[in-house]
Amino acid sequence: MAKKAVLLILAALALLFAGCGDEKGFINFARHAAAPAAPAAERPLVIAFAPVMSPEETRRPYERMTAYLAEKLGRPVTMVQKRGAAELDQLVAAGEADVAFLSTGAYTAYRGHEPIELLAMVETKGTILYRTFVIVAADSEIEDFASLKGRVFAFVDPLSHSGRLAVDYRLLEERLTPEQYFGRIFYTHHHDKSIWAVANHLADGASIDNQIYEHIEQTNPQLAAKVRIIDELAVAPTGPIVVRQNLAPEEKEQLRRIFYEMADDEAMRPVLQSAVIDRFVPPDGGLYEPLRQKFLAHERLSGE
């Protein structure tokens, strides 16, 4: 009996040491095992944007585009709305968005850990370029940009090209920042609200996207009539749609085809136009590089 007991103990010890000797067989209960990745077709595709006009003006067309993508892809698509360009960049940088509608400024300022690539650009009225309008109240005595020095100026967003950065680049020539040039600045977060702020004399001036201004002329002519344009700043490429670089190649190709053909769907044309988009076209990455260099120069000046 004693011999049998010893043999049982030795066998148990052998099993124990065999298990400990093989690292792969060791179960560490301090670690959380990752759940198996769901097939791409089962996971929602996350599409993110930040509104350039008031949310009530912008959200509806993006909801329609999200539903359209879900229908064409045959899988769930989740829309995420962020308040501003910086929040949107952070979401993309964290890898929490598969597709994002970035503003021109947000794209040229992007330096996130998550690599991204261009998928499409917006075309409006036959062009992929837009201008920055500097506006004042219709009854203002201000006639040019120089006369805005020391005045109150409304910006849209710190990373909006037409709503901030274009003015930064204009003042870069004088090695000045807007904080040094204007008496006071504030942010409205939407182009239409910047127009409203100037029209109601909350700001002496503002910088806005010419395409948004022209859209407001059509949809709210009473508001547009209360402001006037005193300057135009350099043209810039429209904001792009980007995707995570590590998204499956076949998914990227499918998304390209859907976006490029979206305007061919008669039901989607008015949806796109309400978001100041005529169609999506293949991107030209070279158009953004000069702005990226200007942004870096602006950062250096701001840090001095």
PLM regions and their residue ranges:
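Bacterial N-terminal signal peptides that target proteins for export
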Residues: 1-9
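C-terminal motif of bacterial Sec signal peptides marking the signal peptidase cleavage site
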Residues: 16-19
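An extracytoplasmic/periplasmic, membrane-proximal ligand-sensing/linker region
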Residues: 21-48, 54-64, 236-238, 242-304
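Bilobed "Venus flytrap"/periplasmic-binding protein-like clamshell domains
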Residues: 42, 47-70, 82, 105, ...
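Extracytoplasmic/secreted proteins, especially bacterial periplasmic and envelope-associated proteins
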Residues: 57-64, 68, 87, 91, ...
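Short helices/loops that flank or line small-molecule/ion binding pockets
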Residues: 86-100, 113-114, 146-147, 190-211
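Acidic, polar ligand-binding/catalytic clefts
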Residues: 90-147
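Pocket-lining segment of extracytoplasmic ligand-binding domains
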Residues: 151-250
